[in-house]
């Protein structure tokens, strides 16, 4: 095979004559006449046209000779005057190469066959070659292949040259010296042409004039189909060549010859076989009649089997269409489908593109050509280096489908006026219609949605394994984690359902191509679905988190329609506030700010500027897991409920427990102006109209959510806050304290209503009146005649009163070159906005501090001192005494005033102060500058009772109880009442069962011999059996349940005793040495961590040294040389080496705070510094309490001196600059029952008047609680602004009232 460069072009014989076009009934009538003589139906035969490169001279000589025979055959002759040209020639140098192609002949009905045939016998490898020339008289040589026989066919002179395909339909490879090899022989199912009498046809004779080609079939490429191919035509084959005895005669396909008697079924003769025979051209009724006449039961079984096979084939076809991955539909080419003609080149492998969709008609030659076409494509694929394409099989349909398709085909044939009369007697077979591009795209879309759903489900499973959450704490209850996981999976399932419902768009597009009956059926289904949905309550929907974040933009502010009527039309349900008109939107808009956070999740008010100013972060926040987006949590329906009852007694309650500071819901309604609020409130006196700004109100009377049922209380458990969300002001309800399930939510509506209203809340501190918004707006129509110099100020006041919300100065861009004064103004504006009320007013107690800072900025010029500025704010914050505002100021100060500004001013000031000291030191011997700790005043740590001077456990000797008492005295030394406890029948103290079981188990033999238990079940503790050292606890108690994560080969204890005789108990505080040894770190480095149930692969080869057992003396240590340590774990490693693990507490002088900060001498601060120390480093015991317990009383046992009892309310960070309150989970409460705790007659007060770095300058007005930290360590300002003048608020208010009265008197006199 000479493979390279060979090309083959397929052609098809088309029964296309003028008679058929102009007189379609002629061929039908002729066919009916010939049907009486039992016309033979011929199957198309494949013919291969071979070509070889020839020289120009040879072409010329051959064309001029005119009468040469074919080079590969015998017994035939050439006709010089009739040339059939197929394609265009290609000239390569001196050679002319004609393209090779495959011809498919199908003789039309009634068309005579006049060609001559030359038969060549031989093997399947026989090749007949011929030279074709672009111009000449040499006819083409056709090499036809059928049943291992090879023929050479010469067409008659009636074949027109105009019937050739256009030049674009054929192609050849410009490669000389290449010979084409015919395709493989067709399958044996292909029938040969029958011997037909030529004389039966009306042949037209040639004359000397131009040839008449009207009765000849046209030669047309397969790729260029025409409308005439819609109806296949049967034809008779040409007369056989009598000179070739190898040709066998086969009857027509319309009549099947009787088989021999031996091949008939048992019990059937030839007559019965003829009556039962079913031919392909029989009528349906005839087939059914024969089946029913033979065996009715068998006919029914055959019909059922046909239906089953049809259903299976249809299902396979749908599955095959659904799994198509290409975006362009590749359908089997059918008759009546126009395709683009493309040159078959080596690089052309793209499928045909369907441009129009016509009904596909059955063909008598389709099934016979499928196999050979596959063989041709396999050969082509091997030559081109690609795999052959798979073809789909043809499916059978049921009788009902056959009838419907037959009717459709008849109707289409009648409409198109196609010459189908000649084919009326053939059976109708059904071929699957071509794939519609729209349906194909819909199928691809459905397949992509299924894939997307699978990927989403897989991604959700992977994400749940990662355990991503906004919470940074790893201590999460398993039940809570399971609930969150279920909620997350539920949200993903709902999102996947929405994706599946996305096919509605495809159905809408498909409606354009629906018929009226399809639309009516779809409407009926929709009506049924709506009826079903109305009969069942709608399920609760969980909204997805990620989509709701990204889709909430300011452009969403529209006036939506009411969602649903609630409580019999009492109000319309909406999810968020909406404007009442378009005129409200400009007044409602709020400026947007950027928090500038680069790490974390915007969770702290001390770090995030937006959270400090009550601004919700937008989607442009630089932090990837920003949690400052409270208002997108629209879960009011899941965590809140409205109690049933009359209209006036409905209240809003919680379904589950809520924590302090948690967002509960949004107070939604219509946003209206002040005038509209006054009009509505005057009519209804409804307290649901709430102010969100000086001139804006939210009306929750007609359109709102369940927040409208929140009641007023003078002692509320929640509060209303106004936040800037996506550029608009929205009101939210936040919890003030921890709320239990089924707790009523109440807020204080003072200064929020349009007018005053009577209060009947029933609280113990009820004010009896709910104050309305105070209107401090001047009348713009007021005329000022006499005092003209204040007209400008009056107008400015009127203009400022109309503005509310975030100050515009906060939007000024900041850079390093900005002036310090501008930054200070921004700090003042931001903090003033934070301390103002919702209506824009400021408390009278804050006005003196506010005016003092404004005066400072005006008098100090362009470069005011930042240290003095910060100190003024410190005094203001001490007067406010609000932890939320303190944290907000830290965030505002750190954002607008960087620490570099403060540090630079501080260094310049210290340089001036230390200049004389430096000169004095330079004259004498050089000495180092005293450290900060050395500069601090440590006299507050001095005491008459140093550490180790007394034993707190001495109080156990006098501690007693009675039989009915609940006092606890356990060998572990702990006083908590957790777990199961047992009471001693001798001393009547209660003990922990876990602790006692360990001691009983370890001393089982001693107890059996000395004091066995009585038969009555009495229990006698170790204190009564003298196993303890007196009446004080002194034992090592091991934990019954070891921790899950622990060191290898280590045991963990509840209490341990060191060599000094001090019993160290879990969760208690002790003193440790300030200077610690380093020897124990080698053992700690060789300890390997393990989890419960896991095994180490290799053993630990490190040998732990044995611990010393000699007792250590108790030393007296000053407190300034010791540190306070919180015990969190006690363990013993191999060699009886005992260790304690915990965290340190910091003294006030160990924190980095400014000199203006005041402390309490009994105050310590929790730190994040953890350490593992030897147990022998514990030198004493102390007690650290929370503020409430410290003020309440002291424990009876162990009894500490007052110098060893401390309070802890704040904790500091690693930098020791940021102070915040200790969270509840890090607090360590003690037993405050009366049997072990003594309360004070008058509770103590925390006095903060101590400054460790400036003892000579105490605070003029000590606040009640601790103040906030500063971002840097600064010295006290030395300026006249330190002393804040005392302001008598009573006198100030009296003066203000007098001025108001005078103004009213003047206005009244003018009007009169």
From Swiss-Prot:
Domain SET per the UniProt entry, residue ranges: 638-750
**What Gene Ontology terms for biological process does this UniProt record contain?**
ectodermal cell fate specification; egg-laying behavior; embryo development ending in birth or egg hatching; embryonic digestive tract development; locomotion; methylation; nematode larval development; nematode male tail tip morphogenesis
List compositional bias (Polar residues) regions by residue number.
1-11, 25-36, 344-367
Alphabetized InterPro entries for the sequence: AWS_dom, BAH_dom, BAH_sf, SET_dom, SET_dom_sf, Zinc_finger_PHD-type_CS, Znf_FYVE_PHD, Znf_PHD
Which intervals hold domain AWS? 590-635
Q: Where is the composition biased (Low complexity)?
A: 54-68, 160-176, 1264-1281
Q: Which GO terms describe its molecular function?
A: chromatin binding; histone H3K36 methyltransferase activity; zinc ion binding
Tell me which species this is from. Answer: Caenorhabditis elegans
List where Gly residues composition bias occurs: 69-78
The gene behind this protein is: lin-59
Its function, per the record, reads: Probable histone methyltransferase. Essential protein required to maintain expression of homeotic genes egl-5 and mab-5. May play an analogous role to the trithorax Group (trxG) proteins. TrxG proteins form multiprotein complexes that are required to maintain the transcriptionally active state of homeotic genes throughout development. May act via a modification of chromatin.
Enzyme Commission number: 2.1.1.-
Protein name (database record): Probable histone-lysine N-methyltransferase lin-59
Annotated Gene Ontology cellular component terms: chromatin; nucleus
Principal place of residence: nucleus
Composition bias of kind Basic residues appears in 383-394
């Amino acid at each position: 095979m000479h493979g390279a460069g060979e090309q083959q072009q397929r052609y098809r014989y088309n029964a296309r004559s003028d008679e058929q076009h102009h007189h379609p009934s002629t061929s039908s009538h002729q066919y009916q006449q010939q049907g009486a003589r039992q016309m033979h139906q011929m199957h198309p035969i494949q013919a291969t046209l071979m070509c070889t490169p020839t020289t120009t001279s040879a072409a010329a000589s051959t064309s001029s000779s005119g009468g040469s025979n074919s080079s590969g055959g015998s017994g035939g002759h050439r006709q010089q005057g009739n040339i059939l040209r197929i394609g265009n020639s290609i000239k390569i140098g001196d050679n002319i190469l004609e393209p090779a192609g495959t011809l498919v002949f199908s003789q039309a009905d009634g068309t005579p066959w006049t060609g001559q045939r030359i038969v060549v016998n031989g093997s399947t490898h026989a090749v007949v070659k011929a030279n074709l020339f672009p111009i000449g008289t040499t006819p083409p040589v056709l090499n036809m292949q059928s049943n291992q026989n090879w023929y050479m066919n010469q067409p008659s002179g009636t074949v027109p040259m105009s019937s050739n395909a256009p030049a674009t339909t054929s192609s050849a490879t410009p490669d000389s010296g290449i010979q084409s090899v015919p395709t493989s022989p067709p399958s044996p199912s292909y029938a040969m042409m029958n011997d037909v009498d030529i004389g039966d046809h009306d042949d037209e004779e040639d004359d000397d004039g131009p040839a008449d080609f009207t009765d000849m079939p046209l030669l047309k490429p397969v790729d260029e189909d025409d409308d005439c191919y819609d109806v296949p035509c049967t034809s008779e084959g040409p007369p056989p060549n009598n000179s070739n005895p190898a040709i066998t005669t086969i009857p027509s396909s319309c009549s099947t010859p009787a088989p021999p008697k031996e091949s008939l079924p048992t019990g059937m003769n030839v007559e019965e076989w003829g009556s039962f025979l079913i031919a392909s051209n029989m009528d349906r009724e005839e087939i059914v009649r024969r089946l029913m006449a033979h065996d009715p039961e068998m006919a029914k079984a055959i019909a059922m089997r046909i239906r089953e096979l049809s259903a299976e084939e249809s299902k396979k076809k749908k599955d095959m269409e659904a799994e198509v991955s290409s975006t362009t539909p590749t359908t089997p080419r059918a008759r009546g489908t126009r395709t683009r003609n493309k040159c078959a080149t080596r690089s052309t492998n793209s499928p045909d593109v369907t441009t129009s969709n016509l009904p596909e008609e059955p063909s008598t030659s389709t099934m016979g050509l499928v196999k050979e076409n596959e063989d041709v494509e396999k050969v082509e694929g091997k030559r081109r280096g690609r795999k052959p394409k798979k073809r789909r099989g043809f499916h059978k349909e049921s009788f009902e489908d056959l009838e419907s398709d037959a009717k459709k085909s008849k109707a289409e044939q009648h409409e198109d006026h196609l010459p189908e009369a000649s084919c009326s007697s053939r059976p109708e077979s059904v071929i699957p219609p071509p794939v519609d591009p729209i349906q194909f795209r819909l199928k691809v879309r459905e397949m992509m949605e299924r894939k997307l759903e699978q990927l989403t489900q897989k991604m959700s499973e992977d994400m749940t394994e990662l355990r991503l959450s906004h919470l940074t704490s790893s201590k999460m209850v398993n039940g809570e984690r399971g609930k969150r996981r279920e909620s997350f999976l539920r949200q993903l399932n709902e999102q996947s359902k929405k994706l599946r419902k996305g096919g509605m768009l495809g159905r809408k597009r498909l409606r354009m191509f629906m018929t009226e009956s399809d639309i009516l059926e779809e409407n009926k289904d929709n009506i049924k679905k709506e009826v079903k949905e109305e009969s069942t309550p709608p399920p609760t929907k969980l909204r997805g988190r990620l989509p709701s974040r990204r889709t909430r933009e300011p452009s969403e502010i529209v006036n939506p329609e009411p969602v649903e009527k609630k409580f019999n039309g009492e109000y319309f349900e909406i999810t968020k506030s909406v404007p009442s008109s378009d005129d409200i939107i400009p007044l409602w808009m709020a400026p947007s700010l950027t928090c500038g956070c680069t790490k974390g999740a915007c969770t702290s008010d001390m770090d995030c500027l937006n959270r400090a100013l009550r601004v919700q972060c937008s989607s442009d926040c630089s932090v990837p897991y920003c949690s400052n987006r409270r208002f997108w949590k629209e879960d009011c329906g899941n965590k809140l409920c409205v109690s049933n009852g009359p209209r006036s007694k409905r209240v809003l309650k919680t379904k589950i427990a809520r924590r302090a500071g948690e967002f509960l819901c949004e107070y939604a309604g219509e946003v209206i102006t002040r005038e509209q609020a006054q009009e509505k409130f005057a009519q209804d006196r409804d307290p649901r109209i709430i102010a969100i700004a000086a001139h804006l109100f939210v009306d929750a009377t007609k359109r709102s959510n369940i927040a409208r049922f929140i009641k007023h209380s003078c002692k509320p458990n929640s509060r209303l806050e106004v936040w800037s969300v996506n550029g608009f002001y929205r009101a939210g309800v936040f919890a003030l304290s921890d709320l239990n399930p089924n707790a009523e939510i109440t807020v204080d509506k003072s200064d929020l209503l349009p007018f005053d209203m009577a209060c009947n809340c029933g609280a113990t501190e009820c004010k009896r009146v709910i104050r309305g918004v105070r209107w401090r707006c001047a009348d713009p129509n007021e005329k000022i005649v006499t005092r003209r110099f204040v007209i400008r100020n009056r107008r400015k006041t009127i203009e400022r009163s109309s503005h509310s919300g975030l100050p515009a100065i906060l939007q000024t861009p900041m850079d390093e070159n900005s002036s310090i004064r501008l930054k200070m103004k921004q700090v003042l504006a931001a903090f003033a906005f934070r301390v103002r009320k919702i209506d824009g007013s400021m408390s009278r107690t804050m006005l003196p501090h506010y005016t003092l800072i404004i005066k400072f900025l005006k008098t100090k010029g362009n470069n005011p001192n930042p240290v003095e500025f910060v100190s003024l704010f410190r005094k203001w914050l001490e007067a406010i005494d609000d932890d939320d505002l303190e944290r907000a100021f830290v965030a505002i100060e750190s954002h607008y005033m960087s620490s570099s500004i403060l540090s630079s001013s501080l260094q310049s000031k210290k340089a001036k102060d230390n200049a004389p000291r430096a000169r004095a030191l330079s004259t004498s011997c050089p000495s180092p500058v005293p450290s900060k700790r050395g500069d601090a005043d440590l006299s507050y740590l001095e005491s008459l009772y140093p550490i180790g001077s007394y034993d707190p456990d001495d109080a156990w000797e006098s501690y007693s109880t009675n039989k009915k008492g609940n006092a606890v005295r356990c060998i572990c030394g702990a006083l908590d009442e957790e777990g199961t406890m047992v009471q001693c029948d001798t001393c009547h103290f209660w003990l922990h069962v876990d602790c006692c079981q360990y001691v009983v188990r370890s001393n089982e033999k001693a107890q059996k011999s000395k004091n066995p238990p009585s038969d009555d079940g009495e229990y006698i503790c170790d204190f009564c059996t003298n196993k303890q050292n007196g009446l004080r606890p002194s034992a090592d108690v091991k934990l019954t349940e070891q921790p899950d994560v622990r060191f290898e080969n280590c045991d963990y204890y509840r209490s341990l005793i060191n060599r000094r005789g001090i019993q160290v108990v879990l969760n208690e505080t002790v003193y440790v040495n300030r200077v610690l040894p380093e020897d124990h770190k080698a053992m700690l480095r060789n300890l390997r961590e393990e989890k419960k149930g896991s095994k180490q692969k290799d053993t630990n080869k490190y040998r732990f040294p044995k611990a010393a057992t000699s007792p250590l003396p108790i030393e007296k240590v000053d407190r300034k040389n010791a540190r306070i340590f919180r015990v969190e774990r006690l363990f013993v490693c191999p060699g009886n080496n005992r260790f304690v693990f915990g965290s340190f507490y910091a003294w006030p002088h160990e924190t980095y705070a400014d000199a203006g900060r005041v402390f309490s001498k009994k105050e310590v601060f929790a730190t994040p510094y953890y350490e593992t120390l030897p147990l022998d480093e514990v030198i004493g015991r102390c007690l650290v309490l929370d503020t409430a317990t410290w003020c309440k009383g002291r424990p009876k046992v162990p009894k500490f001196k007052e110098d060893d009892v401390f309070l802890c309310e704040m904790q500091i960070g690693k930098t020791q600059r940021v102070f915040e309150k200790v969270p509840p989970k890090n607090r360590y409460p003690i037993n405050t029952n009366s049997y072990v705790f003594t309360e004070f007659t008058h509770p103590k007060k925390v006095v903060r008047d101590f400054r460790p770095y400036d003892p000579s300058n105490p605070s003029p007005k000590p606040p009640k609680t601790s103040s906030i930290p500063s971002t840097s360590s600064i010295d006290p300002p030395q300026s006249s602004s330190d002393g804040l003048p005392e302001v008598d608020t009573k006198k100030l208010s009296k003066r203000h009232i007098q001025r108001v009265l005078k103004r009213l008197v003047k206005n009244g006199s003018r009007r009169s």
